[in-house]
A protein has these predicted regions:
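Bacterial N-terminal signal peptides
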Residues: 10-21
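A short, N-terminal "cap"/entry segment at the start of jelly-roll beta-barrel domains
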Residues: 27-76, 163-168
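Double-stranded beta-helix
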Residues: 39-41, 117-120, 139-168
């Protein structure tokens, strides 16, 4: 083997060992980002405090923030209680939306207009993920409770400005 080739192989082996060592060392380290929670939290169904709104949804909804603050930067978890025959027109969010159906059936579809023929029924226990900026809509046929988890500040942007209840 030539000296040049032997040198290249040695350099490659040393590089792999150094990289592997860095990866193993990094696995044992604590996260570098500060952890936002200092204490645990338990919320039972009878401990949920419902409020009217939010104003960004059509009238009839109720919400309860379980942790975090959807208006500020960071993780949050909230619940939405929606009445039967509730409609949320086509909209999008600047961050991923994680939805878990706690009770009832939530219907969701993708597209630029609310179309009851193009949705998916999500019964109790279902989970949905809508990626950031995905145009979607939703509706209920019975009272439904959802758990929404995301990263704030949370926003809802209606495709048709006339659908935005904040503009009325």
């Amino acid at each position: 083997m030539s000296a040049m080739r032997t040198g290249r192989i040695c350099t490659l082996v040393v590089g792999m060992v150094v990289l592997g060592g860095q990866m193993l060392r990094a696995e044992g380290q604590a996260p570098t980002a500060p952890q936002p929670h200092q204490e645990h939290a338990f919320v039972t169904p009878d401990g949920v405090t419902w409020q009217v709104g939010p104003a960004s949804l059509p009238p009839g909804a109720q919400f309860a923030v379980l942790e975090g603050d959807p208006k500020h930067t960071g993780l949050f978890t909230m619940r939405l209680r929606l009445p039967a025959t509730y409609r949320i027109p086509a909209h999008w969010h600047p961050a991923d939306e994680h939805v878990t159906v706690i009770s009832g059936t939530f219907n969701m579809g993708t597209g630029d207009v609310l179309d009851l023929a193009k949705g998916k029924a999500l019964p109790t226990g279902s989970f949905a993920l809508m990626p950031a900026q995905m145009h979607h809509f939703a509706w209920t046929s019975e009272e439904t409770v959802l758990q929404l988890h995301g990263v704030g500040p949370w926003q809802i942007n209606y495709l048709n400005p006339a659908d935005d209840p904040r503009m009325r």
